[in-house]
Structures are given as structure tokens and as C-alpha cells.
């Protein structure tokens, strides 16, 4: 069970969805969660954005390098030619495929839809300096993406976050009988 106390600017607002969070988080990674919220005293200074990120976006969308996110990206770009999307992604340096796939896909999408999107270069995520055994199931990828997407959406004042997922991952089958989801 994970018990986490999150610092937030408005704990009363977050407490209205605390029970939903405690139900949602286990679905995303299979662990049992107990979240609490406390008043954050640190004030985050908003930095100016590069020009390419200051143009409004209709949505922030995952571009993982996989087929589901590629189809989601192409569907949006084709169906909404006057709107822009901000692609976000992350990679684990131990897995060599996703980062290269993400770069290749961005390069190909750029050829046709260059004015309809921006991307935040794929963020490297790893636990290099830890003695904790390595997680090999990738069951937290969705949670990590949502965190990155929330930061990107807040920074660009974008209201919609899309996780294009159509396959078995979207069903989140448990990895073992002791898990509720993967």
C-alpha cells in the first residue's frame, strides 16, 4: 500500500476528489493507494514559454512511439486541421526502442503536419542512484505520462489531455491474481 501526502495549493478542492483518486490510482498501476492533501507553501514561479509553446493547443497528447498513440495523433491531426496538439512522451534508458521510435515518428509527422503540433522532447525517466530492485512491468507508465501531461497542460493553459490507447493496455489486465490491474 502506498500512502502519499501531496502538497497542493488548495487542499479543500483536492479533498473533494480524494476517494476518486484512491480508486483511480490502483487502476493505473495495480498498487493500493491512500492519498492525502496538504497546503503547499512553495509558490512556483511561472517561466516564459518558448514561442512554439505559447500558441494555444487544443490538447496535450501522449506520443509514446507505439501504434495506439500514433493512430491517435494522426486521427487528431487529420480531423482537426485548424487546431494544434502538444505531444509529450517519456522513455526509460534501459529500453532502447521507444526513444528512437518517438524521434522517428515526430520526424515523419513533421513532414505533413508541421504547423499543427509541437512536442516536448521525450523525458528520460530512470532510477540510476537507488538500491531498489528494478521495475520491469512498466505498469506505472500511464501514471508517469499523466503527470508529465498535467504539467505541460498547466504550463500551456491547455484544458484537454488525451491518452490514445486502444489495445489490451487500455483494459489494464492484472499481471497476477494478487493484483487488481497492471
PLM feature spans:
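RNA-binding accessory domains that recognize and position tRNA/RNA substrates
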Residues: 1-61, 72-84, 88-126, 157
Amino acid at each position: 500500500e502506498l500512502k502519499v501526502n501531496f502538497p497542493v495549493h488548495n487542499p479543500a478542492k483536492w479533498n473533494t476528489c480524494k476517494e476518486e483518486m484512491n480508486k483511480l490510482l490502483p487502476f493505473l498501476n495495480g498498487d493500493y493507494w491512500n492519498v492525502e492533501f496538504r497546503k503547499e507553501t512553495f509558490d512556483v514561479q511561472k517561466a516564459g514559454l518558448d514561442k512554439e509553446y505559447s500558441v494555444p493547443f487544443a490538447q496535450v497528447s501522449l506520443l509514446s512511439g507505439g501504434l495506439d498513440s500514433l493512430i491517435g495523433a494522426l486521427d487528431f491531426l487529420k480531423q482537426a486541421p485548424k487546431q494544434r496538439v502538444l505531444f509529450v512522451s517519456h522513455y526509460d534508458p534501459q529500453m532502447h526502442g521507444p526513444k528512437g521510435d518517438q524521434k522517428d515518428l515526430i520526424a515523419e509527422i513533421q513532414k505533413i503536419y508541421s504547423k499543427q503540433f509541437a512536442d516536448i522532447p521525450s523525458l528520460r525517466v530512470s532510477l540510476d542512484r537507488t538500491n531498489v530492485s528494478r521495475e520491469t512491468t512498466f505498469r506505472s507508465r500511464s501514471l508517469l505520462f499523466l503527470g508529465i501531461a498535467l504539467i505541460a497542460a498547466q504550463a500551456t493553459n491547455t484544458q484537454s489531455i488525451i491518452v490514445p490507447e486502444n489495445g489490451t493496455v487500455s483494459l489494464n489486465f492484472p499481471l497476477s491474481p494478487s493484483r487488481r490491474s497492471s
